[in-house]
Amino acid sequence: MQPNDITFFQRFQDDILAGRKTITIRDESESHFKTGDVLRVGRFEDDGYFCTIEVTATSTVTLDTLTEKHAKQENMTLTELKKVIADIYPDQTQFYVIEFKCL
């Protein structure tokens, strides 16, 4: 069995598969992904594979520079997105946006 390249919380799986979630915002430990990378995607909770994505763009962002566009790409409100990011990455300010599409 091949290892997964990136994981998402299970609660995001349906939105990813339906194309409602088209970005992920990560910390520096996952800043190495590049446009064109093809990644196996698993669930964080059990590492179970559920799809393959292609990275379509990457950029940097801070909590203060998150926009409504980012929120829409995450299928959340901007307030929800800022809270989720702050909860997952407390005390961090610099983040990496990975835009993707399911293959």
Swiss-Prot record:
Its EC number is 3.5.1.135. The keyword Hydrolase applies. One of its GO terms (cellular component) is cytosol. It comes from the Bacteria. It holds the Pfam family ASCH. Gene3D superfamilies: Hypothetical protein (2.30.130.30). The active site is at 21 (proton acceptor), 24 (nucleophile), 74 (proton donor). InterPro entries: AC4CH, ASCH_domain, PUA-like_sf. The keyword NADP does not apply. One of its GO terms (molecular function) is N4-acetylcytidine amidohydrolase activity. Residues 6-101 form the ASCH domain. Keywords: Hydrolase. SMART domains: ASCH (SM01022). It catalyses: N(4)-acetylcytidine + H2O = cytidine + acetate + H(+); N(4)-acetyl-2'-deoxycytidine + H2O = 2'-deoxycytidine + acetate + H(+); N(4)-acetylcytosine + H2O = cytosine + acetate + H(+). PANTHER family: UCP029143 FAMILY PROTEIN. Catalyzes the hydrolysis of N(4)-acetylcytidine (ac4C). Belongs to the N(4)-acetylcytidine amidohydrolase family. HAMAP family: ac4C_amidohydr. This is N(4)-acetylcytidine amidohydrolase. The gene is yqfB.
